[in-house]
Amino acid sequence: MNLQQQLAYCQQHQQRLQLRHFDNETAWQLGEKIKRQAEKQGVALAIDITVNHQTLFSYAMAGTCAENQDWLRRKRNVVELLSTSSYAAGLMLQQRETSLDARYGVSLRDYAALGGAFPLQIKQAGIIGSVNVSGAPHLDDHNLLLQVLADFIGLPTGSIELLTPLTPLSV
């Protein structure tokens, strides 16, 4: 899958993975679902769900460390800045051959355009926050969020195209 294909999929994902409502109980249910999926995949994650700058769910699985919390914060900041997933932001920057600090003037100590943070969007209302994970390779973090969100909103298994590592454009 090349860069253009991945960007197109990221746009589709953000359009399709919208919720009808979201409250504190929803955050708890989604966070638990992410934890169970991580356990099933054998990966230790730090998990954070933030709405309107308030943390509604936070959990650090055994095997994570304080560094994972920092990655959560940095990825979440990208969603808040650009209103797109942290993975899609990285792809857009790569396409434009630039970086967060060069394009937006932000510190890379506070922002990370790597997979693992996804906007929480309410249908017909907009983005209210983000769901964030850290602990696996960043593409795996992103794909885990796609899987869990798709299942959480009731999309059929396999209806969301998971992303694969980038391949160069063929000439």
Swiss-Prot record:
Positions in coiled-coil regions: none
SUPFAM superfamilies, per database record: GlcG-like
Protein name: UPF0303 protein YPTS_2661
NCBIfam families (alphabetical): PRK02487.1-3, PRK02487.1-5
Family per similarity comment: Belongs to the UPF0303 family.
HAMAP family per UniProt: UPF0303
Pfam families to which the protein is assigned, alphabetical: HbpS-like
